[in-house]
Amino acid sequence: MAKKSIGQLKLQVPAGAATPSPPIGPALGQRGINIMEFCKAFNAATQEMEKGAPIPVVITYYQDKSFTFSLKTPPVSFFLKKEAQLKSGSKEPGKVSVGSISRDKIRSIAESKMKDLNANDIEAAMRMVEGSARSMGLEVVG
């Protein structure tokens, strides 16, 4: 018989840096999930990824206190800031530009995010990434 799922939890955890300290520990502890077991499994699963990259993770937990988790790709904003070499986006997007990004880089970001985006083709995914870039105050050139 299949295990009965009692909920899901969504977190953004830096790759290879899951620790029992807040915010991870309390979020898992109040749901009865073994914190150290999750931290070890998450860090092992993300050891090949860029250290510190924010990884969205969906944790499904069950009645018998066990859990499974699935990893997503880092947010588009992380890739955009990395490609444009920024620390943060514009305080006033649309008015103040903080930099520019080429369509080639937009395409490479869209290709890497394709499995997590709600898009049918690469062009639609590129438009989504361009929208995120504009919302951060980046100009799309080329």
Curated annotation (Swiss-Prot):
It comes from Bartonella tribocorum (strain CIP 105476 / IBS 506). GO terms for cellular component: cytosolic large ribosomal subunit. One of its GO terms (biological process) is translation. Part of the ribosomal stalk of the 50S ribosomal subunit. Interacts with L10 and the large rRNA to form the base of the stalk. L10 forms an elongated spine to which L12 dimers bind in a sequential fashion forming a multimeric L10(L12)X complex. Forms part of the ribosomal stalk which helps the ribosome interact with GTP-bound translation factors. Keywords: Methylation, Ribonucleoprotein, Ribosomal protein, RNA-binding, rRNA-binding. This is Large ribosomal subunit protein uL11. Coiled coil: none annotated. GO terms for molecular function: large ribosomal subunit rRNA binding; structural constituent of ribosome. One or more lysine residues are methylated. Belongs to the universal ribosomal protein uL11 family. PROSITE patterns: RIBOSOMAL_L11. The keyword Ubl conjugation does not apply. It comes from the Bacteria. InterPro entries: Ribosomal_uL11, Ribosomal_uL11_bac-typ, Ribosomal_uL11_C, Ribosomal_uL11_C_sf, Ribosomal_uL11_CS, Ribosomal_uL11_N, Ribosomal_uL11_N_sf.
